[in-house]
Each structure stands twice: as structure tokens, then as C-alpha cells.
UniProtKB/Swiss-Prot annotation:
PANTHER family membership: ELONGATION FACTOR TS (PTHR11741), ELONGATION FACTOR TS, MITOCHONDRIAL (PTHR11741:SF0)
Chain's role: Associates with the EF-Tu.GDP complex and induces the exchange of GDP to GTP. It remains bound to the aminoacyl-tRNA.EF-Tu.GTP complex up to the GTP hydrolysis stage on the ribosome.
Keyword Cytoplasm among UniProt keywords: yes
Any GO MF annotation of the entry: translation elongation factor activity
Protein's UniProt name: Elongation factor Ts
SUPFAM superfamilies: Elongation factor Ts (EF-Ts), dimerisation domain, UBA-like
Similarity section: Belongs to the EF-Ts family.
Organism encoding this protein: Haemophilus influenzae (strain 86-028NP)
Cell location: Cytoplasm
UniProt lineage: Bacteria, Pseudomonadati, Pseudomonadota, Gammaproteobacteria, Pasteurellales
Keywords from the named record: Cytoplasm, Elongation factor, Protein biosynthesis
Amino acid sequence: MAEITASLVKELRDRTGAGMMECKKALVEANGDIELAIDNMRKSGQAKAAKKAGRVAAEGVILARVENGFGVLVEMNCETDFVAKDAGFLGLANEVADFAAANKGTTIEALQAQFEEKRAALVAKIGENMNIRRVAYLDGQVIAQYLHGAKIGVLVAGEGSADELKKVAMHVAASKPEFVNPEDVSAEVVEHERQIQIDIAINSGKPKEIAEKMVEGRMKKFTGEVSLTGQAFVMDPSVSVGDFLKSVNTSVSNFIRLEVGEGIEKKEEDFAAEVAKITGGNA
């Protein structure tokens, strides 16, 4: 039996909005598998669509560069927001981004090796760990970029107007689509969601045959919600992003979205523990 920790229960609560006891029970039944627990809670009606995993905890910056025919996003992390605004940290981060743009296709390992000496020197000077974490390239005829406070970076590739593609990049930053078009949603993802929806309908008392027919309409809605062109456009929710693109004679071939600290869990300490740490245990 897997250990059901308080942090695991908290994560399930954050992602489902369900009560503490329901979350703990679901985790016990799923032997600590949080994704299975979410699926089971959705099937039983205890939770609706759960939030995606990927709690943002680490600090740092996302930087973007757009060259002729491609763009690049670079993420550099540090431990505190204070250091994320430090001139030395930002200077190194910009050097990294410039190098990545000038040397298209550089891997994250090569990028880390290239700047290891400077990174180590800055760590020694500032006294805080930092890391070049991710680099992502995107090719395209037209590339638009959008940075939201250096915490979220988006590149959108397509054809048509760069100005209109920038509006789409802003939408991607806000709405977090996972695919470009509804038809791009993988068969595995569709089947997984379809089975959950069937089980929800059956658990509500519907016969299996009726449940399967009901689900077809729900699946069309689902693929639209997770795809860029199927989502309601944030600047005009009365139209989809796809409809907006058609109206301005512009198309999207691909996009990349990075957010500082995605998937990194920062250790949390309560106030008493933090004071004790600072005072050497004499809280």
C-alpha cells in the first residue's frame, strides 16, 4: 500500500475541488495513484474536469527570440523572485537566449555546458542556486511571440498576419490549449475521456447504449476545449479562435507555451518552521 501523504491529498483537493476525506478515500482506493484517483472521482461524480498537473512553484524567467524563420524560448530558474529580477541573473539569462537564437538547434545539455562556468560563478556571488532548465525551438513562415511578465512565453507559427498571430499567442498564454486543432487530439486521449464520460452517464442511471450515444456530443465539446482553434477566443468569446483566424485570413501550424517552473514543486514550510530555521531552532 502506497503512503498517502498530506501533500498528495492537498494536490488532489487543489485539482478536483473535492473535500479532504473524499480525496483521501480516493487515493487509498487508487493506491496512491493520483491520476487514477481523479478518473475514479470523475466517474462517481465527486469531481468534474480536474485541473492539469504542473504546479508552478520555482522562480525565474522565460525569454524569447525570433529570427528569420524560427523562434526560441529559454527558461532559466532560480530560487526566489528577488533574484529573478537581479541584473546579474537577467544578464546571464539574456546571454543564454541570444546564444540559443544564434545557434539554432542547440540542446539543453549543450546550452548548460556552454554556460556552466558563468552559472557557477553567479551562484557563488549571489548565494542562490540557478539553472538553465529548458530550450524550445519553433519553425514557421511567420513567427509571433508573446511574453507575459517574463513568467509565460509563447511562440506561434503560421501564415498570414504577424499582428493577428500575436493576438493568438496572447490567447495561448491565457487559455493553455494542448493541441492546434480538434482533429489533432490523439486517439488515446479521446478514448480515455470517452470512457470516463460513458461511466459518468452509466453511473447516473443511463443504459449503456444511451450513454454511448450521449457521449458523442460531449466528445466533440471536449476536443474543442483542449484545442486552440476550437476554443472560444479570449478577445471575443462569441467566436472560436478558428473562426477568428479565418476572418483575418491567417492560419496556425504550431505553437509552444512555456511557464516558469512548470512541473517543479518547491518545498513548502509553515511559518513556525521557517522562523525556527532562521533562528536556529529557537522559535
